[in-house]
């Protein structure tokens, strides 16, 4: 089965159009000001218009204030809130109640210990996203172009819905899909020529790689 594909950190209509043309199921906008992929909520709302009804619009936030969330939800009208900070299970429930939106909770992973917190969010977050933990000195919680040991996710059974992120690109995405039970994949730096600069050609290459990886599965099931 073809995975959900999220292109994150979008800032231009050209990249959004190509992502939609290639079948992206989710498009992500980043509202973390230190990120080179940061976008103002009003601009994100305008850029997201062609995607409505075609792909899920995801607002990516890091420990946001209520005022920040109010503005983002009002201007972007997202389908999903992606929480990439240290939000507690209680805070996740509060955010879901305030905005009536599903939440994708991100966990940054380097070792098995980083996954111990997941259990507390089962039944609270609507979906998980596992990303590589930022290297020392980085101010960015994600989008650093590094991967983690995917075997750390082997204990997760099929009942836990998650997306895989962290250093995915055209060269490793097929391997990632084989080695994990991820129902979705998330790419940002893997389709960029420079931080925050999406490449239409690299978006094409990424989708080509996913389709090639999926083809044997489809053939064997036919």
Swiss-Prot record:
<dbReference type="Pfam" id="PF00697">
    <property type="entry name" value="PRAI"/>
</dbReference>
<dbReference type="GO" id="GO:0004640">
    <property type="term" value="F:phosphoribosylanthranilate isomerase activity"/>
</dbReference>
<keyword id="KW-0822">Tryptophan biosynthesis</keyword>
<keyword id="KW-0057">Aromatic amino acid biosynthesis</keyword>
<dbReference type="GO" id="GO:0000162">
    <property type="term" value="P:L-tryptophan biosynthetic process"/>
</dbReference>
<keyword id="KW-0028">Amino-acid biosynthesis</keyword>
<keyword id="KW-0413">Isomerase</keyword>
<dbReference type="InterPro" id="IPR013785">
    <property type="entry name" value="Aldolase_TIM"/>
</dbReference>
<dbReference type="InterPro" id="IPR044643">
    <property type="entry name" value="TrpF_fam"/>
</dbReference>
<protein>
    <recommendedName>
        <fullName>N-(5'-phosphoribosyl)anthranilate isomerase</fullName>
        <ecNumber>5.3.1.24</ecNumber>
    </recommendedName>
</protein>
<comment type="pathway">
    <text>Amino-acid biosynthesis; L-tryptophan biosynthesis; L-tryptophan from chorismate: step 3/5.</text>
</comment>
<dbReference type="InterPro" id="IPR011060">
    <property type="entry name" value="RibuloseP-bd_barrel"/>
</dbReference>
<comment type="similarity">
    <text>Belongs to the TrpF family.</text>
</comment>
<dbReference type="InterPro" id="IPR001240">
    <property type="entry name" value="PRAI_dom"/>
</dbReference>
């Amino acid at each position: 089965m073809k995975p959900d594909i999220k292109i994150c950190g979008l800032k231009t209509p050209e990249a959004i159009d190509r992502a939609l043309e290639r079948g992206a199921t989710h498009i992500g906008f980043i509202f973390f000001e230190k990120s080179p992929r940061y976008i103002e909520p009003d601009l994100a709302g305008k850029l997201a218009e062609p995607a409505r009804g075609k792909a899920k619009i995801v607002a990516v936030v890091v420990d946001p204030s209520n005022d920040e969330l109010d503005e983002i939800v009002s201007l972007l009208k997202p389908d999903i809130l992606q929480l990439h900070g240290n939000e507690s299970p209680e805070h996740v429930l509060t955010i879901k109640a305030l905005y009536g939106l599903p939440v994708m909770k991100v966990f940054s992973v380097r070792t098995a210990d980083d996954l111990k917190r997941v259990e507390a969010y089962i039944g609270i977050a609507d979906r998980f996203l596992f990303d590589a933990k930022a290297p020392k000195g980085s101010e960015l919680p994600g989008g650093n172009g590094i991967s983690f040991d995917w075997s750390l996710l082997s204990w997760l059974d099929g009942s836990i819905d998650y997306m895989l992120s962290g250093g995915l690109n055209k060269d490793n995405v097929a391997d990632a899909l084989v080695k994990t039970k991820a129902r979705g994949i998330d790419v940002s730096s893997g389709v960029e020529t420079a931080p925050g600069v999406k490449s239409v050609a690299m978006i094409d290459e990424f989708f080509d790689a996913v389709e090639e990886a999926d083809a044997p599965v489809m053939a064997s099931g036919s």
